[in-house]
Structures are given as C-alpha cells and as structure tokens.
Regions:
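Sec-dependent N-terminal signal peptides
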Residues: 9-18
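An acidic, Gly/Ser/Thr/Pro-rich helix-cap/linker signature
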Residues: 19-105, 110
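Second-shell loop/turn segments in exported
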Residues: 73-87, 97-99, 121-131, 147-159, ...
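Short, functionally critical alpha-helical segments immediately adjacent to catalytic or ligand/cofactor-binding
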Residues: 106-123, 183-188, 277-281, 350-351, ...
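Secretory-pathway/luminal and periplasmic proteins that interact with or process carbohydrate-rich
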Residues: 119-127, 142-144, 172-175, 191-204, ...
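Substrate-binding/active-site groove segments that recognize
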Residues: 128-150, 162-169, 194-197
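Primarily a LysM-type cell-wall glycan-binding module
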Residues: 244-274, 317-341, 354, 359-363
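Extracellular LysM carbohydrate-binding repeats and other cell-envelope/extracellular binding modules
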Residues: 280-313, 343-365
Length: 365
C-alpha cells in the first residue's frame, strides 16, 4: 500500500517537465474592468479541422514577415519532424482553448500561444516558477482565482487555467486597444512595463510600435516567435506542412464521481495509462483527488458514456477519505500515529518525511 503511494509520487514528479519558457506578467492589484464573455450566435460553418477554423478566423492572415519572424519560420522548417511533434502536443486541449477565445471575441490564432509558452505541456514549470499551459506566475494566478493547495494546483489544470488565461488575454487586449502585438508583449513582459514604455516613446516623439519600445530581450523575441508559428499554420500548404489531424470537435469530456478518488484506481477503471490520466488532469499533484464531495475527471469524450454507466459501482468500492492533521505544540510522529491507529513509518512515507522532526502548523495525512 505504502509502496504504491511512493510509486505514484515518483510518477507525478517524473511528469513535471521543466520548461525554458518564462512568464513575468504581473497585473496591478487595481485590475481594470474585466471584459465579459460575448453571447453571439456562431456561424454554422463546417470546418474540416481545428487548423482550418484557426486559419479562416485568424486576424493575422496578411501579416508582414520581418527578418526576426523569418528566422523562427526557418528554424521550425529546418526540422519538420520536431515541429510536427510539437503540434501533436496540443491534441487534447486546443479545441477547448479555441472555444474559450471565441467566447471573448479574441483572435483565433491565440489558440497557438501555448505552443510558445509551454509546448502545450500542462506539467511545464519554468525556472522562474511559472506553471502550466499558460505559464501563470503565482501573483497573476491569485488575481484570476487559480487555487494552489496541498492536493491541487490549478495552474497545471489545462481547462481551468485556460479559462483564467483567456480572461487575462481579454483584459490585455481591451487595455491595449485590441493591438495583438501589444497584447502579446504585455502577456510576456507585463502590462505595466509595456504601458510605461509606450508613454515614454510618445513623450520623446519616437515610434510606439512594439519593436521600437525598450523591452526585455525575451519579450522582443516573443512576438516574432508567435507570428512564425501562426504563419506556418495559417499557410501550411505554402510551406508543405502536413498538420496533425485534429477534428473540429470536442475531444474531452467530464466524468463526475462521488468522493475522493485515487488516480491509479481511476486509471484502471477507465482503462487508461496513469500518465495519460495525469496529463488530462494535471492539476492533481498527489496520488488522489482532493478530499471533496465529488471529483471531476477529464477523459477522452468517447469514454464518457461507458464510465458514467459504471461509475456508481466503481465509487462504492474505491472511494477514499483521508484525515488531515495539523501539528500542534507537543505533537510527535509517535503520538500522531497512536492517535490515528497507524505506524510512524507509514506516516513518514505517505508525507515524504526524511526525519522525525515536525514543524508547528505542518499538515500531515
């Protein structure tokens, strides 16, 4: 039992892929008025794929390709196999991202932004502490209500973090006059810095386009990187690129189970590899979902009906309940183990403790 717990811990740790992408965005506490989703009747267009939907609704179709953008285009084209492997990583999330962007009337090509941010990897963690598909920094995540608990990190959750990121992008897009280059620069470098540099150039009578602003090198490179991948997707035939087959339809569904559920038990129930379950539900940071009345799992949509038919039978024998104990004065591992009728060695393994020392207010399972 304990070794299974440790096995799960090491699996989760191995899935946390370090990314070089960094996000230094920080919006002021006195956030500007946030845009509301737009209720519109979507045109009844039968797109052949997600790629076609992005291309036909892109607002960058006739963009000017400067030398920096061409440099990144050539870099992608120099290794078509690597570029294809990059695109495949968005398979389970890009349709959902596109739907959310359309809800706020944002440019469809922003669905490609996670390729720049995180390689569409929900486990991605930068050296600066940014996390998830959208590389949220802690301060920005808090403003947009993303929770971080012992059990759950919503910056890693691909769907919840996407909803927050789209709200943030809508805010930036409105704040900077729906200028896409400004929106991208603000997302990467922070809106306060961008606004300051725009005002400074205006005061000095200098051009105000993003290339003329004094911005960090990373932010300067961010826009052409994005423009390059947009160009290759929107004009894939021109560059002889075979795009992965992503249908223009939802590929993820939701299964809601009663109580707290172990991830490995659910993976066996769904007949999915644990690594895949964690990928679709990357917000779960431990071997089980958070203690709650219900647990929601993202799964391939074709499995939803089958799992819903059998979920009551599954939860009757697989529901778990963990008790959390907060360390108080006078506590020791021996006393806590005696109180909960368990062993000190079990407590240490489950809580990843290397010694018998405890900290005041430390939470133990």
């Amino acid at each position: 039992f304990i070794f299974k717990r440790m096995e799960r811990f090491f699996l989760i740790a191995s899935l946390a892929i370090l990314s070089s992408c960094q996000l230094t965005s920080l919006i002021p506490a006195d956030i500007y008025e946030e845009p509301e989703p737009i209720v519109t009747v979507k045109p009844d267009v039968a797109y052949k794929s997600v790629w076609e939907r992005i291309a036909l609704n892109s607002r960058s179709q006739n963009q000017t390709l400067d030398n920096e953008t061409l440099k990144y285009i050539n870099s992608y084209l120099s290794n078509p196999e690597l570029f294809n492997r990059l695109l495949v990583k968005g398979e389970y999330f890009i349709f959902f991202v596109l739907e959310q962007l359309e809800n706020y009337d944002l440019p469809a090509e922003l669905a490609l932004l996670p390729y720049i941010e995180s390689n569409y990897d929900p486990f991605s963690i930068s050296s600066s502490g940014a996390m998830g598909l959208w590389q949220f920094m802690p301060a920005t995540a808090r403003i947009y209500g993303l929770q971080d608990t012992w059990w759950y990190e919503q910056r890693h959750d691909p769907l919840i973090s996407t909803k927050a990121a789209v709200r943030y992008l809508a805010y930036l897009h409105n704040r900077f006059g729906k200028n896409l280059n400004y929106t991208l620069s603000a997302y990467n470098g922070g809106p306060t810095l961008l606004e300051k540099q725009i005002k400074l150039n205006r005061k000095m009578g200098k051009p105000e386009d993003y290339k003329s602003l004094k911005l960090p090198r990373q932010t300067k490179e961010y826009v052409p990187k994005f423009k390059a991948i947009v160009e290759l997707i929107v004009n894939s035939e021109k560059y002889n690129i075979q795009l992965p087959k992503f249908p223009n339809q939802a590929v993820l569904g939701e299964v809601i189970l009663d109580g707290q559920i172990e991830i490995f038990a659910f993976s066996e129930f769904a007949d999915l590899k644990p690594e895949f379950v964690y990928k679709l539900n990357a917000g779960f940071t431990k071997w089980a979902s958070p203690p709650s009345k219900t647990t929601s799992f993202n799964v391939p949509i074709e499995l939803v009906d089958r799992l819903n038919e059998k979920k009551n039978e599954f939860t009757q024998v697989n529901q778990i309940n963990w008790v959390t104990h907060k360390v108080s004065t006078g506590d020791s591992l021996w006393k806590i183990a005696e109180k909960f009728d368990t062993e000190v060695s079990a407590l240490k393994r489950v809580n990843y403790l290397r010694s018998d020392l405890l900290n005041l207010n430390q939470e133990l399972l």
